[in-house]
Amino acid sequence: MRQPLSWGRWRAMLARTYGPGPSAGYRWASGAQGYVRNPPVGACDLQGELDRFGGISVRLARLDALDRLDAAAFQKGLQAAVQQWRSEGRTAVWLHIPILQSRFIAPAASLGFCFHHAESDSSTLTLWLREGPSRLPGYASHQVGVAGAVFDESTRKILVVQDRNKLKNMWKFPGGLSEPEEDIGDTAVREVFEETGIKSEFRSVLSIRQQHTNPGAFGKSDMYIICRLKPYSFTINFCQEECLRCEWMDLNDLAKTENTTPITSRVARLLLYGYREGFDKIDLTVEELPAVYTGLFYKLYHKELPENYKTMKGID
C-alpha cells in the first residue's frame, strides 16, 4: 500500500505545479525571489494522517513552510495531492486550516472542499473522493442545555428564577449550556451556583426535552436536560445580570401556577409525584462504565437497576 502524502512529496508537487522549486535542503524564501538554503526539515516532516476509514487528515498548522506560500501555489499543490489520493483509493480529505491561514480556504473551496465545522482558532474542510454523495458524518447536531431543579425535601421548597432578558418573565429552573467535556450533573450544579449562589449536589436526571430548529441554538436541534439537585446552602445571592428574580417557592405552588413554562410545570408535578410516592419512580440515576475505547469511560443514565440484576446473580 502506498504511504499517505508526506510534506516532502507535497513540496515536490508544489514545485512541479508552480515552477522550479525547493528540493531537500531548501525552503520558500520570504520577501525574495527563489529559494535559500535551509537544513532538511527532518523531524518537522509531516505526513497526512490516514484514518481507519481510508480518509486523509492534513493539518496545515504543522506545515510551517506554508506561511510563505501564496494561495495560487497552494491550490495547484492541493489539486495534485487530491489527484494522488484519488488514485490511491482514499475515501476523503479532512483539511484543518488555522484561522491565520484562512487565505487557503478559497483555493480549497474551488477544488470542491466544503466546510465541516469551525472552532475558535481553526476551520475544518472536507472533500469526498469516492463516487456518489458524501458519506462523511456531520458535525455536532445538538446543543445541550442543562437546568437544576433544586428541591429541599425538608421544607418542600424549590429554587426558581426569572430570566432578565426574556420577553415574558416566567418562573423556571436555573440552568445554561453545558461546556465541552462537562458532565450533565456538573453543568447543573455549576449553573445553579453561578445564577443563584446556591450550592447543591446532583441526584438524578428527571427529564430530557428535544427540540429541532431551535432559534436559541442557531436554528439547530437542542437537548434540554433537567436534573434533580439537593441543596447544601440556602441563602440566595443571585446574578443580577442574568436573573430578574430568584426565590424558594413551595413545590405545590409551582406545580399549580400559570406563570411558568409547560416544561417547568410538568417537571414540578413530576417532582411532587416523586416526593409523595418515592423518587425511585422518577429518577434516572447515573453509573460510570468502561467504553469500548481503551482507557475511556462514559456515564449511563437509566432507572435504578437492582444489584442482583446488575450482576445477574441468582437470576435464571
From Swiss-Prot:
Cellular localisation: Cytoplasm; Nucleus; Mitochondrion
GO CC terms, sorted: cytoplasm; mitochondrion; nucleus
One protein family per Pfam: Nudix_hydro
Motif (Nudix box): 176-197
PROSITE patterns: NUDIX, NUDIX_BOX
UniProt keyword annotations, A-Z: Cytoplasm, Hydrolase, Mitochondrion, Nucleus
Expressing tissues: Detected in liver, kidney and esophagus (at protein level). Ubiquitous.
MF GO annotations: ADP-ribose diphosphatase activity; NAD binding; NADH pyrophosphatase activity
Main location: cytoplasm
InterPro entries: NUDIX_hydrolase-like_dom_sf, Nudix_hydrolase6-like, NUDIX_hydrolase_CS, NUDIX_hydrolase_dom, Pre-Nudix
Keyword Mitochondrion carried by entry: yes
CDD domains linked: NUDIX_ASFGF2_Nudt6 (cd04670)
Signal peptide range: none
Nudix hydrolase domain boundaries: 141-273
Any GO BP: negative regulation of cell cycle
Enzyme Commission number: 3.6.1.-
Subunit structure comment from the entry: Monomer and homodimer.
Other remarks in the entry: This protein is coded from a FGF2 (BFGF) gene antisense transcript.
Function text: May contribute to the regulation of cell proliferation.
Family to which the UniProt record says this protein belongs: Belongs to the Nudix hydrolase family.
Protein's name in the database: Nucleoside diphosphate-linked moiety X motif 6
Organism: Homo sapiens
Gene this protein is translated from: NUDT6
